Amino acid sequence: MIIFDKPSISPIKTKAMGRRAQLGTDATCRQSVMYDTYRMTARDIVLFLFVFLSLLSCTSDNEPSVTTTNRQTVTVAVTPTLDCLPFLVARDCAIADSMGIELVLIECGALADCDTALISGHASAIMSDYVRAASLRDKWARLMTSQTAGEKQKRTAGDKTVTASVDSLVVFPHQNSHLYMFVNRKSRIREARQMADKMVAVDRYGADAALAAYVLDSVGLTGKTYLVQMQNINTRVMMIENNMMDVAVVSEPYATLLRKTGHKQIYSAAHVKSENVGCLIARKNHQLIRDMYNRACDSITKNGLHHYDSLLIRFSGVPPKAVETMPRHKFLHLE
């Protein structure tokens, strides 16, 4: 009988087989780790794409629309007076935005600065008065004449890049600006006929001087009165507050400020219905600016003047107590 024993395996072969088994196990582990790593990376990529698309959708919602990016820029020069309040309301209460307008306000201390901004082209429109409007029309006519002559000379010289100016000056009268004449509280003046040899702070090239001349002529004043040129309305108020002027012509809200501090009002143009002291002068975008101003006037009429006290306080620098006691004003549309 032949008996076959189990083949004996030498220690060397056993060691080699163990190493191969270990290598096989390591390879399997590496494949598993690589698979796990690949699976985690794919998961991260999917998560990243989800977050990215979410952010992209949010960004697209916040991006301005086509109408917003194509908004028309309108620059208006204003003074710190009540008749300019509709432009503040249009800018800060989204009226201009709703009309597709990017409204930029140039804050000037005097109407003369507004005239300069309009003539130089820095402003599309300004708030002014009827006296300055007449003077500005003459300046504008001379400016257009000189520009036309210069353009003709350049065309004659062969410059084909010259184009004619398309801007035209349009004046819109309004009744939202009223002038008041005040006498210093320490003065003995009680009425206009006592203003002989007195100094009156006015803008000599504006409606202020016209009002002062009208008041003095209406009482038949025989003595001489000195109209002192002070274009900046804040300077006028400061001079009469410091007792350096006898009389000053101002508009709201500075008229209320002088009343609060004890100065005497001797004339008011607020109750003269035919008095169109103020006006808006535009050189471009005429109807667009007119419609924006009128919409803001409707908003003030609807909500009340004192709803916008904070805008007027910040704009004019008049103390809150004076602005809060200012009489009610009805804002009318531009004519």
Where do the PLM segments sit?
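Sec-dependent N-terminal signal peptides
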Residues: 45-53
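Cationic, low-complexity basic patches in intrinsically disordered or flexible, solvent-exposed regions
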Residues: 23, 32, 153
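Short, glycine-/small- and polar/acidic-enriched structural segments
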Residues: 69-222, 227-230, 246-252, 265-269, ...
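Secondary-structure end/capping motifs
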Residues: 287-335
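C-terminal motif of bacterial Sec signal peptides marking the signal peptidase cleavage site
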Residues: 56-57
